[in-house]
Amino acid sequence: MFKNVFGSGFLVRTAHVILTWVITLILFLHDTDLRRQEETGELTLPVLFVLLVLVSVLLYFAVSLMDPGFVLTDDCDLQFTLGIAEETQDMIPQTTKSIRLRRCGHCLVQQPMRSKHCQTCQHCVRRYDHHCPWIENCVGERNHRWFVLYLAVQFVVLLWGLYMAWSGFSHASTWQQWLRTNGVLLGAAAVVAILALTVLLLLGSHLYLVSLNTTTWEFMSRHRISYLKHCGADENPFDKGILRNLWGFFCAWEPVVWEHVYFKQGNDPI
């Protein structure tokens, strides 16, 4: 399930963890609300903050090290992709039983619908969304929901950290004195603000795409994708409506055979 911790993303993950805990330490070393409550023995807020930071780090490692949905061998993946449950055979057009999947020119496996080969990971990934350099892993069928959850938790941590940094700024008679007193905290607040804006944009874009049941790859490259390029600009064969899309993404744990969904919409074989 998990890749080698000391793989190609080791430096990226190490840098993320160091930056996270250095900024947390800065917030506790300056005269912020966290520091003041800790000194007065009111530990509820500091403990909750540290626990939330820890949860964000654990989620980061989960999405970073998790198998995003690599397509492995033809035998097991073809059986999964083309297998049709007896109770649903009558609902699925006959064409789905003879789908000829495209063979990847890189890893030579047959690609299920919505999968794509990642040049960095050197694997085809089911329901490929994108390769994220932040986590040094692909975002795909198995870890996408956890990636969105991580973004949500990380955004809350960053907003809370920004508020704590603001509470720690002290007054001074001159700008020079103010910068000497608050320079380190100001630098930390600037980093947190930039990261918060970045995470907010990522979270918003992913929630929007999830609500449409489309991926970053499909949204950006639909004119190049064989099963989408013949569709109209506003047509998405996987869209079931916002609520059902969100429910399926966050709450449905069973793997989806996207060929079944695609042909139920009356699309022609590709």
From Swiss-Prot:
In the record, what terms sit under GO molecular function? protein-cysteine S-palmitoyltransferase activity
Q: Which residues lie on this side of the membrane: Cytoplasmic?
A: 1-8, 64-145, 204-270
Under the heading InterPro entries, the entry gives: Palmitoyltrfase_DHHC, PFA4/ZDH16/20/ERF2-like
Q: Which reaction does it catalyse?
A: L-cysteinyl-[protein] + hexadecanoyl-CoA = S-hexadecanoyl-L-cysteinyl-[protein] + CoA
Q: Which residues act catalytically here?
A: 132 (s-palmitoyl cysteine intermediate)
> Where do the TM regions start and end?
9-29, 43-63, 146-166, 183-203
Annotated localization: Golgi apparatus membrane; Endoplasmic reticulum membrane
Record's Gene Ontology CC terms? endoplasmic reticulum; endoplasmic reticulum membrane; Golgi apparatus; Golgi membrane
Note whether Transmembrane helix occurs among the keywords: yes
Does the entry feature the keyword Transmembrane, yes or no?
A: yes
Q: Which family does it belong to?
A: Belongs to the DHHC palmitoyltransferase family.
Recorded protein name is Palmitoyltransferase ZDHHC12-B
Q: Which organism is it from?
A: Danio rerio (Zebrafish)
